[in-house]
Regions:
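Short hydrophobic alpha-helical segments that form membrane-spanning helices or hydrophobic packing faces
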Residues: 417, 577, 769-773
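Short acidic-hydrophobic surface loop/beta-edge motif
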Residues: 105-106, 183-185, 563-568, 572, ...
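Acidic, serine/threonine- and proline-rich low-complexity intrinsically disordered segments
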Residues: 439-572, 578, 583-754, 796-875, ...
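Extended active-site and interfacial segments that coordinate phosphate-rich ligands
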Residues: 126-142, 296-299, 319, 353, ...
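C-terminal accessory/binding modules appended to enzymatic or scaffolding proteins
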Residues: 737-802
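Charge-dense polyanion-binding interfaces
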Residues: 136-138, 247-252, 257-263, 428-452, ...
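P-loop NTPase motor module signature
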Residues: 1-428
Length: 894
């Protein structure tokens, strides 16, 4: 194993100006560069500067927090410069710290630092940002778990917040961040209001008809189509480009390099053009010459269900529609907006809403952060309520894996948490040998094989059967060997690639160039965190390397695990369609959930397949667990041992025992005592004890809980004391375990309580009584059929020593419970469906046997079900009685 530094590269120069600084939190690395350029510009005329410049400077100089809500193109980012001048002065020293540009010796002198959400969360977590600092949150509406943690940690540190947002309802942020004012600005020009139409279709290809495209060509329009998936962007661009060669078509999504959009961003794209993009791709891009927007009314978002994030297809919210339409609505003369939806959307009535938060779906990140700081999740004022069940589940998992102990990170946990990777990859890096570091680090740098490749990929020569991880590794290794080499970016070593060669390589294989470049960036960051030199080349995948990788996974197992498409808790999970793993066997990797067309959450997994013998070797063998099996009458006390692997039971062995294992003698006595208390023990005193227990429980109810309760827990403790010194099952069978009722209630008290009436006479018939405790009050319930309910008179009821309640039996239907006859009649007259919806019905069979003393059989004066028969003939008979009667009829002897 290698030594893991406990200080990340971003914190190796922790100093800061004495008077505080401005920390700008950007959503992406690209946004960091944009903000850095914007802070360096002066004298730029913008909508915000023209309409609210003096107001922004006044608020910035007063020291209070505030927000700016404005649409795209109004100059939100450029407003950071005048804000900084009011707070830190005109001598601005600005720098960027992110995964690409680490901290330098000059970092402590910067009075304006631009960081990504991950760096900001780390600095807040380690107290490198204090109350003297001001946080500017750019694009705060782009919610993420990291950003939401930054907001909570910033509030805990006492920081001042200035936030910039696109068109959303600002009421939440105003209250949550204690903002003095919110400046709202818009570049909307009523004279340039777009024509907005809703097309009754959700298929963009159906909408892009010949008529529409001829309209685009005739007017030489610039069209942007926003769709929810990467595949849709490529499909649209391909379909239109093949049919209409006079329309310049292009697509863009998160897997493509930003250089692909250069003609559109710089106004060099020839009209007419059509650009298909994912909704996420449109956020901070100003496309020149755009006058037509087509919006597919769909988005894939993570919805938290039962503590797990489920990828769900939902209609777009008002915020998303307004932001996309705002590209042309009120900004471009003759603009057109088309919304492809089967819903009825009244565009003029759409109003901004509060953003959707993501933190509830990442309880593990919250647990690690809180453990590092030594605080509880309750101590953080999170912007969204945390799923407590999922949070506690994450804490237990982290404790079991040795990362958390006593609500603090262990030494192992600190090594894992400091690395710039997710927790599973951090564990693998900490526990791997140095020769496997290149494999682990690169696999950690690639999001997934599915996100790395297109649907029509051609990667057969690189497939490592049974491992998506190693297949992705092999693709990067080949790209580096053929298209790249060692280089330097911002003075830091990194794998760099020839753009043209890499583009051709990716096009030939169906691999996304952006994923390769992002992997190179992440790989360099990981090696800097490990303080290891970045290798010039990577070893190819061979059988020994594959076996070492599998052994590491089997030994550490930080991922989800599925065996034969089933989880340890019995949930069915399918192998991902794009995975190179087989359906059967052991697969370890990332388990993701998605919502199918019926709304049901389904799981899929991709990762690496492991041989059974590897997990067998790594499985834990329990020393044996004492169990009590009532199904084994001769020897119910048994010793069970099992071979388990992270929740899966691979094998088990069970054998009968007589002598108690010395280290489990107390557990054996507890199990036997529990069996005696529940009445399932095979002991000579068990039968008589069951009768006494039933009587003691009835006495407890009749006494109004004045006597000692004979619950299962109390009886278990009683028999544990009686079994003290017993060391084998044979001694247990010989022990005197007859229940002494006098220890629970004196004999005279038991006799008095059992003399209380067990039945009540109403209208000449007797009905059973049930004694009970309800809301701390002793009551007695009369069980009567529904037809008797309407014959009773409240004034003619006998006096009882406690309140009389009613249970009305209604044949095969659910019974009714009421505190009075009037209430019982009112409930009985209401529709059953209404009572069921209000939870006023109880399952209580009409043939329930009453306490001892209650008369059984048909009531006096009422015929039995056997019409015309004698009363004795209508009663049930035993099989032995019927057999003797048949024998007599045949002339046999009795």
């Amino acid at each position: 194993m290698i030594q893991i530094p406990t200080i990340p590269p971003s914190e190796r120069y922790p100093g800061r100006p004495a008077d505080g600084r401005l920390v700008v939190i950007a959503p992406t690395r690209a946004a960091c560069e944009t903000i850095e350029l914007g802070v360096g510009l002066v004298g730029i005329e913008t909508v915000i500067e023209r309409e609210h410049g003096s107001e922004i400077r006044r608020l910035a100089s007063q020291g209070s927090g505030f927000g700016i809500v404005a649409g795209t193109g109004t100059g939100k980012t450029l407003a950071i410069r005048p804000i900084a001048e009011e707070i830190v002065g005109t001598q601005i020293r600005v720098g960027v710290v992110n995964r690409e540009r680490e901290a330098t010796p000059e970092t402590p002198t910067w009075n304006v630092v631009i960081v990504t959400t991950g760096i900001a969360r780390r600095w807040l977590q380690d107290d490198l940002i204090g109350p003297e600092d001001t946080l500017i949150v750019d694009e705060i509406h782009q919610t993420s778990a990291e950003l939401e943690l930054c907001l909570a940690l910033g509030k805990r540190a006492g920081c001042r917040f200035i936030w910039l947002s696109a068109t959303v309802d600002p009421s939440f942020y105003r209250e949550y961040l204690d903002s003095a004012e919110v400046i709202e600005s818009s570049a909307f020009d009523p004279a340039k209001a777009a024509t907005v139409r809703v097309a009754n279709t959700t298929n963009p290809l159906n909408f892009l008809s010949e008529r529409f495209l001829r309209h685009v060509m005739k007017e030489k329009r610039g069209v942007a189509i926003f769709v929810p998936t990467r595949a849709s962007t490529e499909q649209i661009a391909s379909a239109v480009g093949e049919r209409w060669d006079r329309i310049f078509t292009q697509f863009y999504h998160g897997g493509e390099p930003i250089t692909k959009l250069r003609p559109f961003l710089e106004g060099e794209a020839e009209h007419p053009y059509l650009l298909s993009m994912t909704a996420a791709g449109q956020s901070a891009l100003n496309i020149q010459g755009l006058d037509t927007v087509v919006i597919e009314d769909a988005q894939f978002t993570t919805v938290v269900r039962g503590g797990k994030g489920v990828l769900t297809r939902l209609p777009l919210g008002a915020n998303e529609i307004l932001q996309m339409a705002g590209r042309v609505h009120g900004r471009v003369a003759g603009g057109e907006v088309w919304i492809l939806s089967e819903r009825e959307i009244d565009f003029p009535s759409l109003k901004p809403t509060e953003p959707n938060f993501q933190l509830a779906g990442d309880p593990e990140r919250v647990a690690m952060t809180c453990a590092d700081m030594g605080v509880r999740a309750d101590d953080l004022d999170l912007p969204v309520a945390l799923d407590r069940i999922a949070y506690q589940r994450s804490v237990r998992m982290l404790e079991e894996r040795g990362l958390i102990f006593g609500n603090r990170l262990t030494e192992y946990g600190r090594k894992v948490e400091v690395l710039p990777v997710d927790r599973p990859w951090g564990e693998l890096l900490v526990q791997s040998d140095e020769k496997l570091i290149p494999v682990v680090a690169l696999c950690a740098s690639i999001e997934s094989l599915h996100r790395m490749t297109r649907a029509d990929r051609r990667i057969e020569p690189y497939i490592v059967p049974g491992s998506d991880h190693l297949t992705a590794y092999a693709l990067y290794q080949d790209a580096l060997q053929n298209c790249g080499g060692m280089g330097s970016v911002y003075g830091l070593p990194r794998h760099v690639f020839n753009p043209e060669a890499l583009a051709d390589w990716g096009e030939e294989r169906g691999v996304l160039v952006r994923s390769v470049e992002d992997a190179a960036l992440a790989l360099a960051s990981i090696y800097r965190s490990l303080e290891l030199p970045l290798p010039h080349s990577l070893p190819p995948v061979r059988k020994p390397l594959e076996a070492e990788w599998q052994r590491l996974l089997a030994r550490v197992m930080p991922f989800d695990i599925v065996i034969d498409e089933e989880t340890a808790w019995g949930e069915e999970v399918r192998v991902s369609q794009t995975s190179v793993c087989g359906r059967w066997g052991v697969i370890v990797g990332d388990l993701r959930y998605f919502s199918d067309r019926t709304g049901r959450a389904r799981g899929s997994i991709e990762g690496t397949q492991l041989p059974h013998d590897m997990i067998w070797e790594a499985a834990a063998v329990s020393g044996g667990e004492v169990t009590y099996d009532p199904g084994q009458r001769r020897s119910p006390l048994r010793l069970r041992s099992a071979r388990t692997y992270f929740g899966f039971e691979l094998d088990s062995d069970e054998r009968a025992i007589d002598s108690f294992p010395p280290d489990q003698a107390d557990e054996a006595r507890r199990l036997l005592s529990q069996a005696m208390a529940s009445g399932v023990a095979y002991h000579r005193a068990a039968k008589e004890n069951r009768l006494r227990i039933r009587e003691l429980r009835e006495i407890h109810r009749r006494s109004g809980a004045a006597t000692r309760e004979a619950g299962e827990g109390e009886l278990t403790d009683y028999f544990i004391r009686r079994l003290e010194g017993v060391r084998s099952y044979s001694e247990f069978m010989d022990a005197d375990l007859e229940l002494d009722a006098d220890e629970w209630a004196p004999r005279a008290e038991r006799k008095r309580l059992m003399a209380l009436p067990s039945t009540i006479e109403l209208e000449g018939d007797e009905y059973p009584l049930d004694y009970a405790m309800e809301d701390g009050e002793a009551v007695v319930r009369a069980r009567i059929p529904e037809k008797v309910l309407w014959q009773l008179d409240e004034n003619q009821l006998p006096d009882m020593d406690r309140p009389l309640r009613w249970t009305v039996l209604r044949g095969k239907r659910e019974a009714i419970r009421a505190a009075s006859l009037e209430e019982a009649r009112e409930l009985a007259s209401r529709p059953r469906a209404e009572l069921r919806s209000e939870g006023l019905l109880i399952e209580e069979p009409s043939s329930r046997t009453g306490p001892s003393g209650a008369r059984k059989g048909p009531r006096k004066g009422v015929k039995s079900k056997g019409r015309g028969k004698k009363e004795s003939e209508g009663r049930s008979e035993s099989r032995g009685s019927r057999r003797r009667q048949r024998h007599k009829k045949r002339g046999g002897r009795d």
